[in-house]
A protein has these predicted regions:
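Generic detector of N-terminal low-structure segments
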Residues: 4, 31-32
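Bacterial N-terminal signal peptides
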Residues: 19-29
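General helical structural elements
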Residues: 7-8, 19, 252
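Short, isolated positions within intrinsically disordered regulatory regions of eukaryotic proteins
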Residues: 5-7, 27, 60, 215
Length: 331
């Protein structure tokens, strides 16, 4: 009995990845003329942590400033691995797992060959007992799936279905956001303490949005070809003082979650952009979307356009109106 299977081609996964990550490649499409301006950024090391200091102009052109210290322990606890999906490395990871499993098989029962190819992995099983061959092949297929899932998890990737219903791989943005909440509590607290005690949550959002939008925007020459390597986890955005739309969206999600630990939140993905939604009571002029029966007020931390809380750009509005967006819940 001879059975052979060919794994899903990793090069094909990579080709879809390029499509799946297309929304990460953002052009500055905002029609708003007012731009955020960071006036000062300073980062200083201390025995206990890293002190961050900022000055910027808010939406009213008022000079704002803030400082906060992130303890070394918090920085160490936060995910800092930057995503860069490489199909060949993923293939090698899976191949090693398959070969280790194949070593456990008694050669008297079956002969197994694991053959990595350019864009696939062939699994060949030969043996006299058909049922045994089928069982071995089934087990190896399970090992293959588990190994690939382990690779994705270890490197902070997740599966993603594009608006074109294509399967893809992307950084696990919501996981980055969730695992960065506790490390960023001190940063979120600094903004909370700066807002007037009598103000509502919108004052917090206005302040933190103007700060996020003033952080320099990272325009990559060819983000698609980079396989997602332009993405920076929240701590990295702070350390490097630069970030693109998805990087800033995840940073914002982490800090807002620390401020509102139980309020429902979402990330909204457009073909060329990413923004956020929060389940607060909307005002008359707020741009909202409904997801799973819940109404979310939209906000966009990208910058440098100064877009107020509850408002979106004209391009974003066109995508929302036509339903060309996808939603992921933030835990």
């Amino acid at each position: 009995m001879f059975r052979k299977i060919t794994s899903p081609p990793l090069s094909a996964i990579n080709r879809v990845l390029l499509v799946g990550l297309y929304w990460l490649s953002v052009g500055l499409f905002f029609s708003v003329t007012a731009g955020a301006e960071q006036l000062k950024f300073k980062k200083a090391q201390s025995e206990s942590g890293v002190l961050f200091s900022y000055e910027w102009l808010d939406m009213d052109s008022t000079r704002q400033s803030i400082s906060f210290e992130l303890p070394h322990t918090a920085i160490k606890a936060a995910p800092t691995q930057q995503a860069n999906y490489r199909p060949k490395i993923a293939q090698r990871y899976v191949t090693v797992a398959l070969m280790e499993e194949a070593k456990k098989i008694n050669p008297k029962e079956a002969r197994v060959k694991i053959i990595p190819k350019r864009d696939s992995i062939d699994i060949q099983v030969k043996g006299a007992n058909e049922d045994k061959v089928e069982a071995i092949l089934s087990n190896l297929k399970a090992v293959q799936r588990e190994a690939y899932n382990a690779y994705l998890d270890e490197h902070y990737f997740t599966r993603f279905t594009t608006l074109f219903n294509q399967k893809a791989i992307k950084p696990d943005h919501t996981r980055y956001a969730t695992e960065s909440v506790k490390p960023l509590v001190a940063a979120s607290q600094a903004f909370y303490e700066k807002v007037n005690a009598q103000s509502d949550s919108r004052a917090y959002f206005s302040l933190i949005l103007s700060w996020l939008q003033s952080i320099p925007y990272d325009t990559l020459e060819d983000r698609v070809v980079s396989n997602g390597s332009g993405y920076a986890p929240p701590i990295n955005v702070l350390m490097q003082n630069v970030g693109d739309c998805d990087s800033k969206a995840v940073l914002a999600s982490s800090m807002v979650r620390a401020f509102l630990p139980s309020t429902k939140m979402i990330m909204v993905f457009l073909p060329n952009h990413a923004l956020l939604g929060i389940a607060l009571t909307p005002m008359v002029d707020d741009r909202t979307i409904v997801h799973d029966g819940e109404t979310y007020v939209l906000y966009d931390p990208t910058g440098p356009a100064l877009i107020p809380f509850g408002q979106v750009s004209e391009d974003t509005e066109r995508y929302i109106v036509t339903g060309r967006y996808q939603v992921e819940a933030v835990d």
